[in-house]
């Protein structure tokens, strides 16, 4: 979702976003036992490595050139993989306002372009979808598309069985290996040097909850089940931590106390927080995450995009202790109009485990160019 579109959706986002403008561990454990899938090449346990995060780009034809520079920079680095957190194309409303400046989103041709950019990356690549990639086609006024048909096409194009995308692929496991969740090929898991990763298909724009409530409920149940399996696997494997990668900003503030929320709201807008946040489509997932975190003491990195503001922090509140979880770090990557990426170094000798480095291509920034 673009920054222009954030203004459009401000009325839809609840609470501070508005104020601010053990289940079965199959397939995780089977992969661990065999070492044949879901494990990046050369990933002996215990060493350090780095991976790349990018997302919410490219939206415009001008940004495509900037994205090419980002890809060139990532290709020049030693990375275990690259994760694109979704919204790999423009919002339909942006396209219809400026059709000469962006590709028409969610067409087969645009999907092919996006896939081509992923295949130009020399590292393994994984995608977790965003709302621009399928659910926001309902925003078209001049074109009719079915979001569920587009989701089906996205799944068919971007999720080869058992492998990542990219020039050098890695083995991955999918939630679809469980017959109970056979359609959710996009929920992936893998390991690098003993560290467990998992993607969860949660998108912006209210997670498709208003357009297709039944699809949303089914996918939410799948995501919660996948979340529980990720934590169970991380514990069973003695993983040094856990990395969760998704698209949507899950609105952590919706689970803050009013005292915390009021202080935060005043610090950025001089406004008070509402007495109680309205229900949001991400609440059930956040509640499940809180429950898992209450029984997990190792570092967790929660990666997302959606609101296009690079930031890190400790935003998940524990209602039992009335404190924020020190061992969960949020990382939101850059997004349109900024064309940059984030390198995460995994350092087993560090208490935090994750060392986060924003990476800029100077030619992509008017700030650098002005200097």
Could you tell me what each predicted segment is?
Residues 1-14, 21-28:
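N-terminal secretory signal peptides
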Residues 36-108, 239:
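N-terminal active-site segment of His-dependent metallophosphoesterases
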Residues 50-54, 80-85, 90, 124-129, ...:
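Structural recognition of the beta-strand scaffold that forms the well-ordered cores
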Residues 60-62, 90-93, 129-138, 205-210, ...:
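Active-site environment of divalent metal-dependent phosphoester hydrolases
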Residues 75-81, 191, 196-198, 211-316:
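His/acidic metal-ligating clusters that form di-metal
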Residues 99-222, 226, 316-345:
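Extended active-site neighborhood of metal-dependent phosphoesterases/phosphodiesterases
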Residues 307-371:
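Binuclear metal-dependent phosphoesterase catalytic core
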């Amino acid at each position: 979702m673009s920054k222009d579109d954030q203004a459009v959706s401000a009325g839809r986002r609840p609470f501070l976003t508005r104020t601010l403008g053990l289940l079965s561990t199959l397939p995780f454990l089977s992969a661990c036992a065999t070492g044949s899938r879901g494990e990046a090449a050369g990933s002996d346990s215990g060493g350090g490595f780095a991976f790349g995060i990018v997302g919410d780009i490219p939206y415009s034809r001008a940004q495509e050139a900037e994205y090419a520079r980002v890809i060139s920079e990532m290709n020049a680095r030693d990375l275990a993989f690259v994760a694109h957190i979704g919204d790999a194309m423009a919002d339909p409303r942006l396209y219809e306002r400026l059709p000469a400046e962006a590709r028409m989103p969610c067409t087969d041709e645009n999907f092919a372009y996006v896939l081509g950019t992923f295949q130009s990356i020399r590292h393994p690549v994984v995608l977790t979808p965003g709302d621009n990639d399928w659910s926001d086609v309902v925003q078209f006024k001049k074109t009719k598309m079915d979001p569920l048909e587009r989701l089906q096409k996205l799944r068919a194009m971007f999720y080869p069985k058992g492998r990542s995308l990219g020039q050098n692929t890695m083995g991955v496991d999918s939630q679809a290996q469980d017959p109970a969740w056979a359609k959710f090929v996009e929920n992936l898991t893998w390991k690098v040097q003993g560290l467990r990763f998992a993607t969860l298909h949660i998108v912006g724009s209210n997670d498709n909850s208003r357009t297709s409530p039944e699809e949303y409920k089914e996918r939410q149940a799948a995501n919660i089940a996948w979340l529980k399996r990720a934590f169970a696997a991380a514990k069973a494997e003695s993983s040094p931590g856990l990395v969760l990668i998704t698209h949507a900003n899950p609105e952590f503030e919706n689970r803050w106390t009013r005292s915390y929320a009021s202080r935060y709201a005043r610090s950025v807008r001089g406004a008070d927080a509402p007495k109680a946040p309205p229900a949001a489509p991400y609440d059930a997932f956040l509640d499940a995450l809180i429950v898992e975190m209450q029984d997990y003491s190792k570092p967790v990195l929660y990666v997302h995009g959606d609101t296009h503001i690079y930031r890190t922090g400790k935003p998940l509140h524990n209602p039992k202790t009335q404190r924020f979880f020190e061992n969960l770090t949020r990382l939101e990557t850059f997004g349109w109009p900024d064309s940059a990426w984030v390198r995460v170094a995994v350092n087993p000798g560090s208490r935090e485990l994750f060392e986060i480095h924003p990476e800029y291509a100077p030619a992509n920034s008017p700030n650098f160019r002005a200097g």
